[in-house]
Amino acid sequence: MHSTRTVARRLQRLVVGAIAAVALLAAAPSATAQTLQQVVKERGLTQQDVLAAAKTYVPTGKRDEFVAFSSGGQSGMVIVYGVPSMRILKYIAVFNPEPWQAYGFDEESKAVLDQGRINGKDITWGDTHHPALSETNGDYDGQYLFINDKANPRLAVIDLHDFETKQIVANPIFQSQHGGAFVSENTEYVIEAAQYAAPLGGAYAPLERFNEDYRGGVTYWKFNREKGRLDASQSFSLELPPYSQDLSDFGKLASTGWSFTNSFCSERYVGGIERGRPPFEAGCSAKDTDYLHVINWKKAAQVAAAGKVKMINGHKVIMMDTAIKEGLVFLIPEPKSPHGVDVTPDGDYITISGKLDSHSYVYSWKKIKAAIDAKNFAGKDPYGLPIIDLKTALHTQVPLGLGPLHTQYDSKKGIAYTSLYVDSMVARWDYINGKLLDRLPIHYNIGHLMTMHGDTVKPRGKYLVSLNKLAIDRFQPVGPLHPQNHQLIDIGGNKMSLLYDMPVPLGEPHYSVAIEASLLKPGIRYKVGTNTRTGEISPHKTRAGEERTERSGNKVTVHGTLIRSHITPEIIEVNEGDEVTIHLTNLERAQDQTHGFTVSKYNVNGSWEPGKTATVKFTADVPGVFPYYCTEFCSALHLEMQGYVLVKPKGYKAKVGDLMAKDQYTQADYEKQVKACVETQAVIDGVVGFITGQNYKDFAPVVALVEDATEQLGYAEGPKGKAEEEAAKGNYHSATLWAGQWWQYQVKAADIGLRAKTYLEQHGSKPVK
């Protein structure tokens, strides 16, 4: 009890000291403060440096205008950061376990990872490449994010209500993929294209039968928006030639109902350096062009629904002969080794760049559609797919530089931006009139690039992010493995200007998307008892007072709760060999009050956000005493948020002991603690008086804080009653301890209330009558 009072006094002294320090600084001579001119001079900054800093600076407490979602490459995650500040906000765990979010550690998230098992094997990593935001009428709606795994052909669904991965689907017929994810205008379907050809379904065939037995393809995953899940039963694929299919895009507006997919290595070359053959890179770049696949996906969906498919591994596949008969797939020559097919915002044009060509090609959808309608074909490929002549489909070719790769669009009509990998530049150009307008050097070897809403019907302009493959000398050296470099570029004027370099320290990002921050509406808490991976209330939801430990044979099940600053139960007793299941519910309602849980030496880990229920399991196969504690700092008494798992050895015979401390608290101690509770309640009443005297209901964050403070204070009634009950019996030791718990709940309520009071003061609240 005395230690608790001591902590309170120390906190009070710290607060008073901080206020005094601020007052001294305010009263200090102005000579101690540097002027902007002095800072600029001392750091050797130019006027352009200062302007760039001002353009990217987001003041403390303020937020970015845009939020970017970047693939995380080998990290298997998605990186979230703000634009223009370029501050990293979060890594979203997707395809591999991640301990901070406890993804792959609790049973609920393990179930999501298990969805991504292939051939009965756990796949514990992923190579994320191409994220796609859900769309409504061709523009981002901020509801869902999709991301692919190139290494193991899979797609994942992330719900942007809480930035958690909800589903993983493994492609049932592909052995690899690269071109995913891309969404249709209203997110009816998500495209996933195969990359390296292989027999569909996973069968074996020798490379000598590459042309006959190896195939490419594209899968259209049906998305059920109401459930927020991909529906395998309503999804289908098209069999395609063994060209290496790459990236895709859906048509927009004028080209609605169609999709477009790149390819490379249309030579169908098979390497083999060890056999004395030239490598893949030589044989796969022999031709001057590769093939763009133009697919009538709406008609294909009808064909699949009509049952004109072959079932492979339980999946509907429209075979090539059916696609030809139904008029679903058409080919057009494209610049060789492309990586990106990008439909313009109005859907009238498609731009494609080949890394081995210095031009970007602009195709006219009107010309393509006219050729299809008139059956104006130059011939057929070896598999019978009709080919539209390049000249028939082409609008213009624009020389941009060496290694053109990926294109995104500006809010200004006709303006596009293309990455130039070899030149290490970004090109700004007019795709309607076929003119190069500007080029800007970047650092170094740009891959993809991203503009704000740049692949939608309504690009926002303002900023471009260059996703560079090499950083070389741009950052502090950290060893041979360098961070990646994302460079922010101002595209608001007629000339591009470089603003900022952002190191990306984990994984090699590929593609990114950026959305207006105002379109994202993430929650800050769950309904109490939520299984966050399914969105449903868990059958293991536990309220205060419902905590229990149950045994059935050698199975021990614990239903517990987490709240500042204790884990209930605090003692878990099991026998060696028991299978232990612990269901925990975070009872907090306050924003950002996450709790963690771990059991020493048993590889148990979990993260519980406010309202979440999740489960951890382990077999108590080692006897001994194993502490557990909250791994997320949550309060002044965080270190005291602890407990023990006692694993009794086989054959152990219990000994009677007394848990009561030798030093007993007295009536005087009890009365001191009660006095502290009364004084604390007076502070709370004063804070409540201030808040209710303001227009606090106009501030949603304050309303949430008030609700949480009220709930925390409500918890105090239980220990208060127990303290009074024990005191009435003359058991002042127990009464003092329960009074201390009563005070703990008061302190938490006061802390939340003071946060609400500060928020109102800083955000201009007004008195009400």
Residue spans for each PLM region:
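Predominantly soluble domains enriched in secretory-pathway, periplasmic, or organellar proteins
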Residues: 33-548, 617, 753, 761
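N-terminal edge beta-strand
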Residues: 549-579
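Bacterial N-terminal signal peptides
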Residues: 16-27
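Bacterial N-terminal signal peptides that target proteins for export
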Residues: 3-18
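Amphipathic, heptad-repeat alpha-helical segments
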Residues: 662-718
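C-terminal amphipathic alpha-helix
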Residues: 663-687, 724-769
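Histidine- and aromatic-enriched segments that form or immediately flank copper-ligand environments
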Residues: 167, 583-613, 636-644
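Extracellular/periplasmic metallocenter environments
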Residues: 545-546, 608-664
